[in-house]
A protein has these predicted regions:
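Core SAM-dependent methyltransferase catalytic element
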Residues: 310-335
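Class I SAM-dependent transferase core
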Residues: 99-146
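Conserved SAM/SAH cofactor-binding pocket of Class I
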Residues: 131-223, 229-233
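Conserved Class I SAM-dependent methyltransferase catalytic core
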Residues: 247-303
Length: 335
């Protein structure tokens, strides 16, 4: 496994980048290129569907690379090439458990691109999520780009995670400069690898809490923030506030002032309903009803993560919907 000539885009963070981390990036990128060249594809499902698949007879261990890097199943040391296994072990991309090996990352397909993210189950506080929400988020961005005539010079993906949103924009608008921001160093690192693998040179990954670490205004702001209420307060999952809606509301408040005339916010999130009332919409409608904006609100899926209704805090919730809020700053009329 040759890792000497694998360029990785620089990640801008508020701390120095260790040499070990740079080597990790090279190995991850080389692995991604190998999987891509071999025609690897995997669609990541919900955690519950993942659990059900892995619980089936014969699925306790991996038989091929999709089992290893998609289904996160433990595997025998001889399943991958020896040199590749050694490099992945050395960089903690795979680990040894009870005589078997296990990947610490997953690789998922989105259109023609591959994305590295955290392995199943995503229990660590710095997990980088990718799943059905990511696919719907990408669809929402694609729909907006296909209908909008506004020129995009500067765009940003807030809470970028794997960088999927930023990379979708960068591929569709090669002339745009796209920032991918997150508070999670693992997310920034994965975003840099994924951008390099996608062949985009107009994405930069930065540490920022929403927009606090950025400057200037944007022609397009996109976000797919955590929207669940999580007792463990895991950053990739917990949206805070009333049934997980606080971060989404905060993004709306902070983003609108940073839109250029004609610029848009495309926010994909979850909206819990209690007694027929959409709690997220009830909080943001007074904000977006300002005269300077026009907006649309769409339910992409009326019922997601239904199993969460059995968890503490959701006893009064009827459902959680996957929604897209699009807010556009109305351009000033020319004189």
């Amino acid at each position: 496994m040759n890792i000497e000539a694998a360029p990785v885009r620089e990640v801008q963070t508020d701390s120095s980048v260790a040499i070990d981390d740079i080597e990790l990036d090279k190995v991850l990128l080389q692995l991604g290129r190998r999987l891509q060249a071999d025609g690897y594809r995997f669609v990541t499902v919900t955690p519950l569907t993942h659990q059900r698949n892995n619980a089936r007879a014969g699925n306790q261990t991996a038989h091929d690379v999709r089992d290893v890097f998609g289904w996160s199943r433990p595997f025998e040391p001889g399943l991958l090439p020896e040199a590749e296994t050694a490099a992945l072990l050395e960089n903690a991309i795979i680990s040894e458990q009870a005589g078997l090996l296990r990947s610490e990352v997953r690789w998922s397909s989105l259109n023609d691109s591959l994305f590295v993210h955290s392995a199943y189950p995503t229990v660590a506080h710095d997990s980088v999520f990718f799943g059905p929400d990511t696919y719907r988020f990408a669809q929402a961005i694609g729909k907006h780009l296909s209908h909008s005539r506004h020129r995009i010079e500067n765009a940003i993906d807030i809470g970028c995670g794997s960088g999927a949103g930023a990379i979708v924009i960068a591929l569709a608008r090669r002339e745009a400069q796209v920032q991918a921001v997150d508070i999670n160093p693992a997310a920034l690192r994965f975003t840099a690898v994924n951008a390099a693998l996608a062949g985009v040179t107009n994405v930069s990954a930065w540490h920022s809490d929403v927009l606090q670490g950025t400057h200037g205004n944007f022609d397009l702001i996109v976000a797919n923030p955590p929207y669940m209420q999580d007792p463990q307060a895991r950053a990739y999952r917990d949206g805070g506030g009333e049934l997980g809606s606080a971060l989404s509301v905060r993004i709306v408040r902070e983003a609108l002032d940073r839109l250029t005339p004609g610029g848009s916010l495309v926010l994909y999130t979850g909206a819990p309903s209690v007694a027929g009332v959409d709690l997220f919409l009830a909080q943001v409608q007074p904000i977006v009803d300002a005269a300077a904006f026009e907006w649309t609100y769409e339910e992409m899926d009326p019922d997601v993560f239904g199993e969460e209704l059995e968890t503490p805090g959701y006893q009064q919730a009827e459902r959680i919907a996957a929604v897209v809020l699009t807010v556009t700053r109305i351009p000033r009329p020319s004189i």
